[in-house]
């Protein structure tokens, strides 16, 4: 199983975060996709940074990004391994300028996530992990292991969601 080194992917996430933050503190336009979700130059810029960097790092691994023209389902089903990317997760939060958005990069193998990274540019905090490496937080230049609690049978799941997606369906 291929597992990327954080030293290779952290700079990609941070560069995407820089592209986002360059737009965050200035006026920007908001477009709307077919599903009526917002799209900004920050989404597009972060997408380009990540897709180009992953293509250089792992040219044999396809990238499925929220902002790219998706391959057909038939093609995607043939992928045994791919990068799954949301270059700016929380565009509504970005637009409202509340700081609650992230850069998300995951490696999927045989339909299961094996490695993932979440970077919060406003907080300058990064979390990453995988089955083989555990879970880690990087903040203030320090990297520390964090604990992942296993779910105990019979206890309710704790789920975190965006305030902009709060509805009866998400409760």
Where are these regions (language model features)?
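Residue-level signal for inorganic ion chemistry
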Residues: 20, 43, 54, 91, ...
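Residues that scaffold the ATP/ADP-binding catalytic core of kinase and kinase-like folds
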Residues: 23, 93, 138
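Conserved protein kinase catalytic core
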Residues: 72-73, 92-95, 126
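Acidic beta-strand-loop-alpha-helix segment within the catalytic core
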Residues: 105-171
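Residues embedded in well-ordered beta-strands
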Residues: 6, 10-13, 62, 82, ...
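N-terminal subdomain of lithium-sensitive/metallo-dependent phosphomonoesterases centered on the IMPase/IPPase/PAP
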Residues: 1-88, 164-170
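Glycine-rich active-site/cofactor-binding loop and its immediate structural neighborhood
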Residues: 79-118
């Amino acid at each position: 199983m291929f597992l990327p080194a954080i030293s290779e992917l952290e700079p990609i996430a941070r560069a995407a975060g820089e592209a986002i933050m360059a737009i965050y503190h200035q006026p920007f336009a908001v477009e709307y996709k077919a599903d009526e979700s917002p799209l900004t130059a920050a989404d597009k810029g972060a997408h380009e940074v990540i897709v180009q960097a992953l293509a250089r790092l792992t040219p044999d691994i396809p990238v499925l990004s929220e902002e790219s023209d998706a391959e057909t389902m038939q093609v995607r089903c043939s992928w045994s391994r791919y990068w799954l990317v949301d270059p700016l997760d929380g565009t509504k939060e970005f637009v409202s300028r509340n700081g609650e958005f992230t850069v998300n990069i995951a490696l999927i193998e045989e339909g299961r996530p094996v490695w993932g990274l979440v970077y919060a540019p406003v907080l300058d905090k990064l979390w990453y992990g995988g089955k083989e490496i555990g879970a880690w937080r990087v903040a203030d230049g320090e990297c520390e292991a964090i604990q992942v609690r296993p779910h105990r049978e019979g206890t309710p799941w704790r789920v975190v969601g965006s305030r902009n997606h709060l509805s009866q369906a998400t409760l």
